[in-house]
Amino acid sequence: LGDVYKRQVAEYCEKWLLMQSAKVSSGTLRGYTQTMNNYIVKPLGDMYLEDVTADDIRLAMIPLASKSAGLYSKVNMLLKCVFYSAERSQLLEYNPCEGLSAKGGKPGKKINALTDEQVKLLLDTVRGLPPYTFIMIALYSGLRREEILGLQWDCVFLDVPTPYISVRRAWRSENNRPVISTTLKTKAARRDIPIPKCLTDCLREVKEKTESEYVVADRNGNPLSSSQFQRVWKYVTVRSTKPHNYYKYVNGQCVKCTVTPTPGSHQKNNPKLVYAIDFDVTPHQLRHTYITNLLYA
């Protein structure tokens, strides 16, 4: 190869990302850019493409052995995409990613579905609170977080023989501002989901009280921002019986204190707040619970 093809890895990574910008969402592109800068450009960026060997690739992957399997797989995919693209453009005579194993990283923590008792306790604890509608939709329709936060009433069909939700939009956050898109995660994500009577009744009640076009909305009727959703979910975590940290001033100094609530006890400053949730629960776990119940139905 002549000097005309002398291209540094960092330069070609930037070009590859530019080529992807026409095909992927801005959020996906941001994720690619961050991962590429941290795990590909840092160790390999100053090298010329044709000078990179299989050993260089494997050495670059070593720090990822202690990271999650998901991150390992993502970096592996990006490396292969970049070098196979360079090979197709005839910038390489030899592709150093050939034979690179996709297996590596630490396996993710297993997500356990909630039991029927845990579901009942969770719903009883947050009934009447801001996260209740979100939790009901996730538990009884299996929608992803971004699908629930982007759900509008024109896709909720309650007055038909078999009530259902039609997934046609997705939410994402850009600079902590909600963006609603008709571009879904996959083709299969565009689907109609029958819903049970308990969710139908819940949604009917919510619909009667709201003027917003969004099923889950802020007080102004707008879709939630990322920070607003975190505050909504705080209603769940603050009712956990896990140790809670708080800070107080003692003799003019800020001191960190830890309290471990007993199940059923009340918060001193807010007697209405009951510490009742003695298990871990995340938004994704609600969807996992729905899918698990479908499998065993």
Which residue stretches match the model-derived regions?
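Short, small-residue-biased leader/transition segments that mark boundaries at the very start
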Residues: 1-5
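Charged catalytic carboxylate motif
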Residues: 8, 12, 35, 56, ...
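N-terminal core-binding DNA-recognition domain of tyrosine site-specific recombinases/integrases
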Residues: 17-91, 96, 108-110, 222-228, ...
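Conserved hydrophobic/aromatic pocket- or pore-lining residues that grip, position, or stack substrates
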Residues: 40, 57, 79-82, 90, ...
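Short, basic (Lys/Arg/His-rich) helix/loop patches that form interaction surfaces
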Residues: 69, 120, 124-129, 141, ...
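Basic, Lys/Arg- and aromatic-enriched nucleic-acid-binding interface segment
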Residues: 69-77, 88-153, 159-162, 188-189, ...
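Basic, Lys/Arg-rich DNA-contacting stretches centered on the C-terminal catalytic core
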Residues: 104-106, 110, 125-126, 146, ...
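Short, polar N-cap/turn motifs at the start of nucleic acid-interacting alpha helices
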Residues: 155-164, 280, 297
